[in-house]
Amino acid sequence: MSRIGRLPIEIPKGVEVKVTPDNVVTVKGSKGTLEKKFPPIVNIEVKDNQVIVTRKGDDKEEKAMHGTTRAIIANMVKGVTEGFEKALEIVGIGYRAAKQGKKLVLNVGYSHPVEIEEKPGIEIIVEGNNKIIVRGIDKEKVGQVAANIRRVREPDAYQGKGIRYAGEVVRLKEGKTGKK
């Protein structure tokens, strides 16, 4: 059995988990509601204030989906209670971020500012002009929006300029050594 998959998920107070016969899991909490459909190769049941995930067979695909399904449901429960956040920092002279209504405007060395629209269920906060925080209840969406922001100007390998995750270490390459 999958080591992660066999662990039951405790349902905290104030969280409601429903599973339909066609494997659609709905998690309701104080921060919102999440819904996701899972493949029929896993069984999901709610009993004794716990969510238990089991698999129907022992194929390689079923074993993989067992742990994955359990981890996704655990993240859904955590999302509706605590939420998720990802922080990014902007490094570089003249590089800055600003919030204009529901848009994030990035000035990161291009001839034009780059605008990123705020998606439903995702909140983008700008602290100062070089720190961006992405918050939401869906871990997958928070990570994807943060990755899209980072992709606008990835950290440069020679000077380290660009947008990076908070705490990300960028290894700098050595520049050319000129002839003497």
Curated annotation (Swiss-Prot):
It comes from the Bacteria. GO terms for biological process: cytoplasmic translation. One of its GO terms (molecular function) is rRNA binding. Keywords: Ribonucleoprotein, Ribosomal protein, RNA-binding, rRNA-binding. Pfam families: Ribosomal_L6. SUPFAM superfamilies: Ribosomal protein L6 (SSF56053). Gene3D superfamilies: Ribosomal protein L6, alpha-beta domain. Coiled coil: none annotated. InterPro entries: Ribosomal_uL6-like, Ribosomal_uL6-like_a/b-dom_sf, Ribosomal_uL6_a/b-dom, Ribosomal_uL6_bac-type. The keyword Ligase does not apply. One of its GO terms (cellular component) is cytosolic large ribosomal subunit. Part of the 50S ribosomal subunit. This protein binds to the 23S rRNA, and is important in its secondary structure. It is located near the subunit interface in the base of the L7/L12 stalk, and near the tRNA binding site of the peptidyltransferase center. Belongs to the universal ribosomal protein uL6 family. This is Large ribosomal subunit protein uL6. The lineage of its organism: Bacteria, Bacillati, Bacillota, Clostridia, Thermoanaerobacterales.
